[in-house]
């Protein structure tokens, strides 16, 4: 043994308190010659082997009964490839020494990761099956700059943190190690002695797969192949495209009837995908599928941002689901949560014993409402972790859009906080400048790297320019949820019709700000939980009126400017609130034809009619695409407007939000001729009263509402009708 290795070093190494194992272990030049040292707990004999011949070159001496071996190779001066023959419990095993391999992360990668500008950090960090110097294994790397020691533990080393301590790259704070023989499918974690001397066991922030709760280990898994983005998928996201989104929680859309267990990704591909296609939706939006420990969070408190949840199957099963959606002509939107993460000890919280991913001050780093931690967007490595994750889902899974959750909680430092509970920014303001820059940067990078994919913001305030370009001072999102429209219209619809005349502006106010953003009109999962009731149950009146109100509302929503979003169950008027632990009430559609079938047929017809007529979607964000015909008839709660396409073709939309049919209702129009009724929410086909206009009506050369020509219609009770002018 070389006199350079003293007993204190051996003790520290065996105790797991030595931060630089490569300085001791592996092959080293010493005054005595080439010396090989190995830490192999429980081994009894160790030989150095010549791989080509299998010849034993030297037997290593056991210098410590806890497993430290060392020996000099005679007549060798230059480093060479070797193996170790190790006897454990009477059985000899031939292994490759992890400590004979050089640094793994290239200097450029290390620099980019430290700068926070590595577009795809997941290609370097995490666990990657690889072949090095002809040896198959897995290279591991994890960012933990303040840890005193980090080891890889897993099924390949008996979860023993003494066996595979990692190399620290001080310039980046990244620990790395290549472990020969570790392979896909094996479980692993990082064992570390943190900055405070505490022993911690952490899952991999960059793991591509993870165990299903309540277990928390990561799985070695190869990086998915890139998914080519097609022109059809790009076009389906554009501003002039028809976008009708079916929002789904995969764990409760439908369950196995015999045991109430979830459907798998592949079963959902076979059932959910064809259903959404048949219903006429253009997009599927998935509540977060990132791995998460608590079912009741619905996925909005993720611990594995890079890992699809194992609740429904493997990573490849999820890819199969997305491929099936694309084959059916459906784009896929993923709810993405870069705003906060849970406090679970096995995940990101105090990752290396310090507030690495989160702010240290709870006034900046703690969400009081959700008992979660807030990312420190000003830290370059943290921002890089998140930006890379956005790119990962789009490039590696073919996700077509990201819907960013709780944007308001990110961009305001005083979000849901009282005075004294938040820290102003450097200019004394309430805006979180680092979060704003992070969102702008994310949207910019996605626009540059994956043209055609888009982002949508759930932003609940009037922050200006959410869906405006960064060079105009905006955040750079493509779309923003119109939560104001949603609240106003639902508040209106829950009123008894006799009182609606006093709240007429709740339906018209949205047009005053409609062109300030690129809006999506959402009836999301948030509107059918926490005692808010189902959408159907918010409607006033008896059963007939409830369904009629709902149908009229849907007819209004699908005609109003903006893309559409409907949470699962609302398409057939589920009567109870959503329960994430149970299937939707599909039994409502069993037996004979009923009101629920009627609503389902209406939503299907709305989708198909909306998609067929460009006037209903082509100019959602252009004032030319909309015009009021009747806006002030609050006494009768009647509203009529025109939707228009680029060629000037018009569709008339008329809504009567009282149970009183309005006969001979005359209003002025722009284009005289024969107007055909293409949708009537009061049709008997939808279980309405079947009032209407006999399928079509001719205009009269009678002036009305400042226009030379007019129509005289029957407006059915609690109904919305659409009319299109037939060609001459």
From Swiss-Prot:
<dbReference type="InterPro" id="IPR006048">
    <property type="entry name" value="A-amylase/branching_C"/>
</dbReference>
<dbReference type="Pfam" id="PF22019">
    <property type="entry name" value="GlgB_N"/>
</dbReference>
<dbReference type="InterPro" id="IPR006047">
    <property type="entry name" value="Glyco_hydro_13_cat_dom"/>
</dbReference>
<comment type="similarity">
    <text>Belongs to the glycosyl hydrolase 13 family. GlgB subfamily.</text>
</comment>
<keyword id="KW-0321">Glycogen metabolism</keyword>
<dbReference type="InterPro" id="IPR014756">
    <property type="entry name" value="Ig_E-set"/>
</dbReference>
<dbReference type="InterPro" id="IPR017853">
    <property type="entry name" value="Glycoside_hydrolase_SF"/>
</dbReference>
<feature type="active site" description="Proton donor">
    <location>
        <position position="458"/>
    </location>
</feature>
<dbReference type="InterPro" id="IPR004193">
    <property type="entry name" value="Glyco_hydro_13_N"/>
</dbReference>
<dbReference type="GO" id="GO:0043169">
    <property type="term" value="F:cation binding"/>
</dbReference>
<keyword id="KW-0119">Carbohydrate metabolism</keyword>
<dbReference type="Pfam" id="PF02922">
    <property type="entry name" value="CBM_48"/>
</dbReference>
<dbReference type="InterPro" id="IPR044143">
    <property type="entry name" value="GlgB_N_E_set_prok"/>
</dbReference>
<dbReference type="Pfam" id="PF00128">
    <property type="entry name" value="Alpha-amylase"/>
</dbReference>
<dbReference type="InterPro" id="IPR037439">
    <property type="entry name" value="Branching_enzy"/>
</dbReference>
<dbReference type="GO" id="GO:0004553">
    <property type="term" value="F:hydrolase activity, hydrolyzing O-glycosyl compounds"/>
</dbReference>
<dbReference type="GO" id="GO:0005978">
    <property type="term" value="P:glycogen biosynthetic process"/>
</dbReference>
<dbReference type="InterPro" id="IPR013780">
    <property type="entry name" value="Glyco_hydro_b"/>
</dbReference>
<dbReference type="GO" id="GO:0003844">
    <property type="term" value="F:1,4-alpha-glucan branching enzyme activity"/>
</dbReference>
<keyword id="KW-0808">Transferase</keyword>
<feature type="active site" description="Nucleophile">
    <location>
        <position position="405"/>
    </location>
</feature>
<protein>
    <recommendedName>
        <fullName>1,4-alpha-glucan branching enzyme GlgB</fullName>
        <ecNumber>2.4.1.18</ecNumber>
    </recommendedName>
</protein>
<dbReference type="InterPro" id="IPR054169">
    <property type="entry name" value="GlgB_N"/>
</dbReference>
<comment type="subunit">
    <text>Monomer.</text>
</comment>
<dbReference type="GO" id="GO:0005829">
    <property type="term" value="C:cytosol"/>
</dbReference>
<keyword id="KW-0320">Glycogen biosynthesis</keyword>
<keyword id="KW-0328">Glycosyltransferase</keyword>
<dbReference type="InterPro" id="IPR013783">
    <property type="entry name" value="Ig-like_fold"/>
</dbReference>
<comment type="pathway">
    <text>Glycan biosynthesis; glycogen biosynthesis.</text>
</comment>
<comment type="function">
    <text>Catalyzes the formation of the alpha-1,6-glucosidic linkages in glycogen by scission of a 1,4-alpha-linked oligosaccharide from growing alpha-1,4-glucan chains and the subsequent attachment of the oligosaccharide to the alpha-1,6 position.</text>
</comment>
<dbReference type="Pfam" id="PF02806">
    <property type="entry name" value="Alpha-amylase_C"/>
</dbReference>
<dbReference type="InterPro" id="IPR006407">
    <property type="entry name" value="GlgB"/>
</dbReference>
């Amino acid at each position: 043994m070389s006199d350079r290795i003293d007993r204190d070093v051996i003790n520290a190494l065996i105790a797991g308190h030595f931060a630089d194992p490569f300085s001791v272990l592996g092959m080293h030049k010493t005054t005595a010659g080439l010396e090989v040292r190995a830490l192999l707990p429980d081994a009894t004999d160790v030989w150095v082997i010549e791989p080509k011949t299998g010849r034993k070159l030297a037997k290593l001496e056991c210098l410590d009964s806890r497993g430290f071996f060392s020996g000099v190779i005679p007549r060798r001066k230059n480093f060479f490839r070797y193996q170790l023959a190790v006897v454990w419990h009477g059985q000899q095993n031939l292994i490759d020494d992890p400590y004979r391999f050089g640094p793994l992360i290239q200097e450029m990668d290390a620099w980019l990761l430290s700068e926070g500008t590595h577009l795809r950090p997941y290609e370097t960090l995490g666990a990657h099956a690889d072949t090095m110097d002809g040896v198959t294994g897995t290279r591991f790397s994890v960012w933990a700059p303040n840890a005193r020691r980090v080891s890889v533990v897993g099924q390949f080393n008996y979860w023993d943190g003494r066996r595979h301590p990692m190399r620290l790259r001080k310039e980046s704070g990244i620990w790395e190690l290549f472990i020969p023989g570790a392979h896909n499918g094996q479980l692993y974690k990082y064992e570390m002695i943190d900055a405070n001397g505490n022993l911690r066991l952490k899952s991999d922030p960059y793991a591509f797969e993870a165990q299903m709760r309540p277990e928390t280990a990561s799985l070695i898994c190869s990086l998915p192949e890139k998914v080519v983005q097609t022109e059809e998928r790009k076009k389906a996201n554009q501003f002039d495209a028809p976008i009708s989104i079916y929002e789904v929680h995969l764990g409760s859309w439908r369950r196995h009837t015999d045991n109430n267990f979830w459907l798998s990704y592949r079963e959902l591909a076979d059932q959910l995908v064809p259903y959404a296609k048949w219903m006429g939706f253009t997009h599927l939006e998935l509540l977060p599928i990132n791995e998460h420990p608590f079912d009741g969070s619905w996925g909005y408190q993720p611990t594995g941002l890079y890992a699809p949840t194992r609740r429904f199957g493997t990573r490849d099963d999820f890819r199969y689901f997305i491929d099936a959606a694309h084959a059916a002509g459906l784009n896929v939107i993923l709810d993405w949560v870069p705003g906060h993460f849970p406090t679970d000890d096995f995940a990101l919280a105090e990752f290396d014993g310090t507030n690495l991913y989160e702010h240290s001050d709870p006034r900046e780093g703690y969400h009081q409402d959700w008992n979660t931690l807030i990312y420190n967007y000003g830290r370059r490595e943290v921002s890089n972790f998140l930006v890379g994750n956005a790119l990962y889902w789009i490039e590696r899974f073919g996700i077509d859009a990201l819907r960013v959750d709780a944007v308001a909680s990110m961009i305001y430092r005083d979000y849901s906080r009282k005075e004294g509970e938040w820290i102003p920014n450097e200019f004394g303001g309430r805006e979180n400048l680092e979060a704003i820059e992070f969102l702008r940067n994310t949207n910019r990078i996605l626009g540059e790297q994956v043209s055609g994919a888009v982002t949508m913001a759930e932003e609940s305030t009037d922050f200006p320019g959410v869906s405006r370009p960064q060079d105009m001072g905006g955040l750079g999102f493509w779309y923003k949820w119109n939560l104001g429209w949603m609240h106003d219209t639902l508040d209106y619809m829950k009123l008894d019709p006799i009182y609606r005349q006093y709240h007429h502006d709740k339906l018209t106010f949205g047009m005053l700000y409609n062109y300030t953003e690129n809006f999506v009109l959402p009836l999301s999962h948030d509107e059918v939980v926490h005692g808010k009731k189902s959408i159907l149950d918010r409607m006033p009146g008896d059963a007939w009126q409830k369904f009629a109100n709902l149908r009229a509302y849907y007819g209004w929503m699908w005609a109003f400017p903006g893309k559409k979003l409907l949470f699962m169950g609302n398409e057939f008027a589920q009567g109870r609130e959503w329960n994430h632990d149970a299937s939707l009430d599909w039994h409502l559609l069993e037996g004979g034809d009923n009101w629920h079938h009627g609503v389902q047929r209406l939503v299907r017809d709305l989708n198909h009619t909306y998609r067929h007529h460009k006037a209903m979607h082509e100019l959602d964000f252009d004032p030319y695409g909309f015009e009021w015909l009747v806006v002030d008839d609050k006494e009768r709660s009647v509203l009529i407007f025109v939707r228009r396409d680029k060629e000037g073709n018009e569709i008339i939309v008329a809504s009567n939000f009282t149970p009183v049919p309005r006969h001979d209702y005359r209003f002025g129009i722009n284009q005289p001729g024969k107007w055909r009724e293409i949708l009537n929410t009061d049709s008997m086909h939808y279980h309405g009263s079947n009032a209407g206009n006999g399928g079509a009506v001719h205009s009269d050369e009678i002036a009305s509402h400042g226009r030379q020509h007019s129509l005289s219609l029957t407006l059915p009770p609690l109904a919305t009708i659409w009319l299109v002018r037939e060609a001459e």
